[in-house]
Amino acid sequence: MKVLSVSSEVFPLIKTGGLADVSGALPIALKAFGVETKTLLPGYPAVMKVIRDPVVRLEFADLLGEKATVLEVEHEGLDLLVLHAPAYYDRPGGPYLDPLGKDYPDNWRRFAALSLAAAEIAAGLLPGWQPDLVHTHDWQAALTSVYMRYYPTPELPSVLTIHNIAFQGQFGSEIFPGLRLPGHAFAIDGVEYYGTTGFLKGGLQTAHAITTVSPTYADEILTPEFGMGLEGVIATRIDNLHGIVNGIDTDIWNPATDPVVHTHYGPTTLKNRDENRRSIAEFFHLDNDDAPIFCVISRLTWQKGMDLVANVADEIVAMGGKLVVLGSGEAALEGALLASASRHPGRIGVSIGYNEPMSHLMQAGCDAIIIPSRFEPCGLTQLYGLRYGCVPIVARTGGLNDTVIDANHAALAAKVATGIQFSPVTETGLLQAIRRAMHFYADRKLWTQLQKQGMKSDVSWEKSAERYAALYSSLVSKGM
């Protein structure tokens, strides 16, 4: 089976979040199930800088008003189609934001162009290659299925994956003519959304199947609390909605071989984590004692529940624990966490910014990782924690609920528990979870059981890829 994947970011070329991890890892995992994937992405400067010897496969004289070229290149096991359109993508800043952190005012055109190019490839414009199915990711690629509906193309099935419904690609009605869609596409069954132009909304209306990145999140986005205004649209597509948990690259995230981990280990050699623990204490200037080290590796935002962490930091120390934080985000939260470190030298350490090697070492040396997100479509950090024996303490929401088995009496008795869940997502709820962790940590046999069971969890892409391959096959066989 041949699949065209369309994404605004793909790891390892360009990444701002989990979207890149999925669009980079899933095509490789799908190979084992006979799926050949070509991935279309924008030719940002960071992408053009690293690709080598690309081949020109397609040229557009007028892609929504600008010239563009589709380049094909292989990169680290990925078959890439790079949309080289300097007028759209060759600019400073990131994929979506200018150097001042503001949205590019023409983001609607930049990603409509990506979607239109994808629809043209789906229609057979790429010489010698015709996909059987198109898989698009988030609002930036969601117009692909809209163009496929309204432009004369082969009847190809399409899948739209929602990684985070909070990002919807909603623009004013005045941009609609620039999309070059027929007038009747600006309607309730098209891109119109309360008088605006909705990219994700249009994709939800036109894709043959919709997936989210966990079963719980698929249920949550049907509710006003999590649906962000689109719950009504999604409810009309409930028969085509699927929740499939993300995986992680277990070759990159492997405590037995990870090059940045000071001392390698596995489920039967957990004692080797002690050296990594000492390295964490040294980096964060912590006292070198046996108190449990709780860690946070996160964007420091309200959505991630970081205000809760800041507010309970003193209590963690009072209970006899230590806390280390790695991340950046809202200035007020950064300041609150730094202030807690100043109040408790040797017990709390905070590093503002992101440090990929340190994130690996923290998973390999800390005792538990706190993930108190108010909503979390899937989450990857808890999967890294499971893999590394860093016991996850998670809010009972989204993918956190689907991937961490709470250490309740039944799960402990059956020896299947892998972490600690809490609800409601409040300071009180988080403190209760940390108290439970402290209680379990005092019983080293029980704590080791939690670590080992977590490390046995299958967090690879294999099961997820199998489910995607099955979904693809069902759509293609139905001739949708």
UniProtKB/Swiss-Prot annotation:
Keyword Transferase: yes
Residues binding ADP-alpha-D-glucose: 15
Pfam families, sorted: Glyco_transf_5, Glycos_transf_1
Known EC number: 2.4.1.21
Summary of the function given for this chain in its UniProt record: Synthesizes alpha-1,4-glucan chains using ADP-glucose.
Catalytic activity: [(1->4)-alpha-D-glucosyl](n) + ADP-alpha-D-glucose = [(1->4)-alpha-D-glucosyl](n+1) + ADP + H(+)
Family: Belongs to the glycosyltransferase 1 family. Bacterial/plant glycogen synthase subfamily.
GO MF assignments: alpha-1,4-glucan glucosyltransferase (ADP-glucose donor) activity; alpha-1,4-glucan glucosyltransferase (UDP-glucose donor) activity
PANTHER family for the chain: ALPHA AMYLASE DOMAIN-CONTAINING PROTEIN, GRANULE-BOUND STARCH SYNTHASE 1, CHLOROPLASTIC/AMYLOPLASTIC
Pathway the protein acts in: Glycan biosynthesis; glycogen biosynthesis
Organism field: Rhizobium etli (strain CIAT 652)
Keyword vocabulary terms for this entry: Glycogen biosynthesis, Glycosyltransferase, Transferase
InterPro entries, per the entry: Glyco_trans_1, GS/SS, Starch_synth_cat_dom
Gene Ontology cellular component list: cytosol
Cited HAMAP family: Glycogen_synth (MF_00484)
SUPFAM superfamilies to which the protein is assigned, alphabetical: UDP-Glycosyltransferase/glycogen phosphorylase
Entry protein name: Glycogen synthase
Gene Ontology biological-process entries: glycogen biosynthetic process
Residue ranges that the Swiss-Prot or TrEMBL entry lists as coiled coil: none
Domain of life: Bacteria
